[in-house]
Amino acid sequence: MPHLAELVAKARTAIEEAQDVAALENVRVEYLGKKGHLTLQMTSLRELPAEERPAAGAVINQAKQDVQDALNARKQTLESAELNARLAQETIDVSLPGRTIENGGLHPVTRTIDRIETFFGELGFSVVTGPEIEDDYHNFDALNIPGHHPARADHDTFWFDAKRLLRTQTSGVQIRTMEKQQPPIRIIAPGRVYRNDYDQTHTPMFHQMEGLIVDKDISFTNLKGTLHDFLRNFFEEDLQVRFRPSYFPFTEPSAEVDVMGKNGKWLEVLGCGMVHPNVLRNVGIDPEVYSGFAFGMGMERLTMLRYGVTDLRAFFENDLRFLKQFK
């Protein structure tokens, strides 16, 4: 079949001259498609004697296979060339720095809580937590707060019903701890508290941390020394600190603690006092044997003083321009 060899030669030439995969596909259809030149060669077999057809068919099939192999090889070459060209256009300089992702930062109130927990942790205090939905006994009664106290009024407290409320202080955590644990006790209780108030210096929800020590021979001197050290550590200054006599139902004697501000004025930072004997009795601790001190402070208040923030509400408005200053 001299004509067959000529067809294969032409097919090879067309394959080599194809400059892209699309042109190569046209060559395949021309020679190997249903009406391709080599495919039609099979129709000539009917003109041959029966005994010659198998050999002739084998020759045609081999020719078709040779052309298919040439097509496959050329296709691989063209695809590699196209890939290399595309990669050359999309060259990446691997020495360039990657895209940086802006790191987040801790909220300033969280920073304050962490800082205080670290300080008192080094003094042996444990961090304890409690429920934010509290009962009136742990929030008021056990803390020696009488039924007529204004803190119980609806305009100050969020009540669910006559017995349940959103806690107004974390002092309930102290009561729950003393109910379960006998002295010595040394804890701090951070957490969210709720009061019905909203203005430049008050929000309905804020963060508070209270501390408690109960042991033998605990005195007001221990309280003063602890808080002196804490405030100087927290503000990183040798601050002037004063204790003013005050009143809290759950401590006796009680005091409010002030620090001298940069403007020469005293700034209130926390309240404290010796645990009231009635509170100890309410949790089954003998006040003739044990004594203790407690203190409480607002985290937002301390954060405002530390960072010079003038509006408490800024902590809850999620303004990134404000929050990024503390990263």
Swiss-Prot record:
Disulfide bonds: none annotated. It comes from the Bacteria. Mg(2+) binds at E252. SUPFAM superfamilies: Class II aaRS and biotin synthetases, tRNA-binding arm. It is an enzyme of class 6 (ligase). GO terms for biological process: phenylalanyl-tRNA aminoacylation. The keyword NAD does not apply. Its cofactor is Mg(2+). GO terms for molecular function: ATP binding; magnesium ion binding; phenylalanine-tRNA ligase activity; tRNA binding. GO terms for cellular component: cytoplasm. Its main location: cytoplasm. Keywords: Aminoacyl-tRNA synthetase, ATP-binding, Cytoplasm, Ligase, Magnesium, Metal-binding, Nucleotide-binding, Protein biosynthesis. Binds 2 magnesium ions per tetramer. It catalyses: tRNA(Phe) + L-phenylalanine + ATP = L-phenylalanyl-tRNA(Phe) + AMP + diphosphate + H(+). Pfam families: Phe_tRNA-synt_N, tRNA-synt_2d. Belongs to the class-II aminoacyl-tRNA synthetase family. Phe-tRNA synthetase alpha subunit type 1 subfamily. Tetramer of two alpha and two beta subunits. This is Phenylalanine--tRNA ligase alpha subunit. The lineage of its organism: Bacteria, Pseudomonadati, Pseudomonadota, Gammaproteobacteria, Enterobacterales.
